[in-house]
Amino acid sequence: MGKLIAVWGSPDSGKTTFSVKLAEALYNRSRGKSAVIVVFTDIVTPTIPVIFPNFRSEDVFSVGTILTKPDFFADDVVSNMVMTKDRMNLGYLGYKDSENKHSFPDYTEEKAKYLYDVLVGIADYVIVDCMSLPDSNFLTSVALEKAEQVIR
């Protein structure tokens, strides 16, 4: 069972940068043997296009796609992760460019909890880059609730 780490703080405080750097450090410390997943919860300003600016839109997937499915499993989550070829144990989940809170139907708190249960079941570390306002979405509020460690 993996460890859920939530990164939370004020707007523009470097949460996303810290989340990516922490994921890289954990991945490198294990020499690529630890599976690390970063979840970007920001639906207002999607992070995936910022982290992967040169990826084609068909090579980038959305966490919103997973959350709108009636049922999903570990394979569905893995197939919707963004990974680079040289770091197959380092995955990223988040929203794509041009997506916003109106792009997908609403999902439940239980579905967010289930997503994190699936993620900690398949990864050694799950790092959640939370939105500054915990009530902004269930991905943020559930991560702060379920995290073994909250970095602020």
What residue spans do the PLM features occupy?
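P-loop/Walker-type NTP enzyme "switch/lid" segment
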Residues: 38-121
